[in-house]
Swiss-Prot record:
<dbReference type="GO" id="GO:0022627">
    <property type="term" value="C:cytosolic small ribosomal subunit"/>
</dbReference>
<protein>
    <recommendedName>
        <fullName>Small ribosomal subunit protein uS3</fullName>
    </recommendedName>
</protein>
<comment type="subunit">
    <text>Part of the 30S ribosomal subunit. Forms a tight complex with proteins S10 and S14.</text>
</comment>
<dbReference type="GO" id="GO:0003735">
    <property type="term" value="F:structural constituent of ribosome"/>
</dbReference>
<dbReference type="InterPro" id="IPR009019">
    <property type="entry name" value="KH_sf_prok-type"/>
</dbReference>
<dbReference type="Pfam" id="PF07650">
    <property type="entry name" value="KH_2"/>
</dbReference>
<dbReference type="InterPro" id="IPR018280">
    <property type="entry name" value="Ribosomal_uS3_CS"/>
</dbReference>
<dbReference type="Pfam" id="PF00189">
    <property type="entry name" value="Ribosomal_S3_C"/>
</dbReference>
<dbReference type="InterPro" id="IPR036419">
    <property type="entry name" value="Ribosomal_S3_C_sf"/>
</dbReference>
<dbReference type="InterPro" id="IPR004087">
    <property type="entry name" value="KH_dom"/>
</dbReference>
<dbReference type="GO" id="GO:0019843">
    <property type="term" value="F:rRNA binding"/>
</dbReference>
<dbReference type="InterPro" id="IPR015946">
    <property type="entry name" value="KH_dom-like_a/b"/>
</dbReference>
<comment type="function">
    <text>Binds the lower part of the 30S subunit head. Binds mRNA in the 70S ribosome, positioning it for translation.</text>
</comment>
<comment type="similarity">
    <text>Belongs to the universal ribosomal protein uS3 family.</text>
</comment>
<dbReference type="InterPro" id="IPR004044">
    <property type="entry name" value="KH_dom_type_2"/>
</dbReference>
<keyword id="KW-0689">Ribosomal protein</keyword>
<dbReference type="GO" id="GO:0006412">
    <property type="term" value="P:translation"/>
</dbReference>
Length: 221
């Protein structure tokens, strides 16, 4: 059976960057990695209603900077920045003895962000909305935002069936093997009365061409 590699991991260093931007020696590497994982889990849980699509972590000597990509920056920031101050205090349980900086980045096209799309489908499944309807409506909204293609998959006891299965739907093109293709990927889980249902979303936003090649072509023209 053909297995799918993670679209982001496959393109790291080619057209995509790292979500963890830091360097550590062998002694500290494992601790930093565990700390990163705990931070991401906590922030996603604490700010779930804000629609977090991505969290980037940058580290310096005694400083940790979080770039939080969110659909609702007002929910994260709070009244007069109270939300950020509260988040910083809670993060001291995971980050000790370091200065914490939080940068909020607004996600413009929420309907075409793979992680937010997956979470939206999962939320609808938990409200007992038909999985086919949830998937198709989410895909149609995304296609209106000018993306090249979208694919969704739901796995589990769909509709309360005795036997678990996977159903896929797609619109447009999704070139998963093309490294220059900008593929956004999101995963979420829906906790239903019949058990967990996994939701995966792939969004194709177009090709990313190497800048050097484009510059050469422009010079030759």
């Amino acid at each position: 059976m053909g297995q799918k590699v993670h679209p982001h991991g496959l393109r790291v260093g080619v057209i995509k960057g790292w979500d963890a931007k830091w360097y550590a020696n062998k002694k500290d590497f494992a601790d930093n990695l565990v700390e990163d994982n705990q931070i991401r889990k906590f922030v996603k849980k604490e700010l779930f209603s804000a629609g977090i699509s991505k969290i980037e972590i940058e580290r310096a000597a005694k400083r940790v900077k979080l770039n939080i990509y969110t659909a609702k920056p007002g929910v994260v920031i709070g009244k007069g920045g109270s939300g950020i101050e509260s988040l910083k205090k809670k993060l001291t349980n995971y980050i000790s003895g370091k200065n914490i900086l939080i940068n909020i980045v607004e996600v413009k096209s929420v309907e075409a962000e793979a992680q937010l799309m997956a979470e939206n489908i999962a939320a609808q499944l938990e409200k007992r909305i038909s999985f086919r309807r949830a998937m198709k409506q989410t895909m149609q909204r995304a296609m209106r935002h000018g993306i090249k293609g979208v694919k969704t998959a739901c796995s589990g006891r769909l509709g309360g069936a005795e036997i678990a299965r996977t159903e896929h739907y797609h619109e447009g093109t999704i070139p998963l093997q093309t490294l220059r293709a900008d593929i956004d990927y999101g995963f979420a889980e829906a906790n239903t009365t019949y058990g967990k249902i996994g939701v995966k979303v792939w969004v194709y936003k177009g090709e990313v061409l190497p800048t050097k090649k484009v510059e050469k072509e422009e010079a030759n023209a």
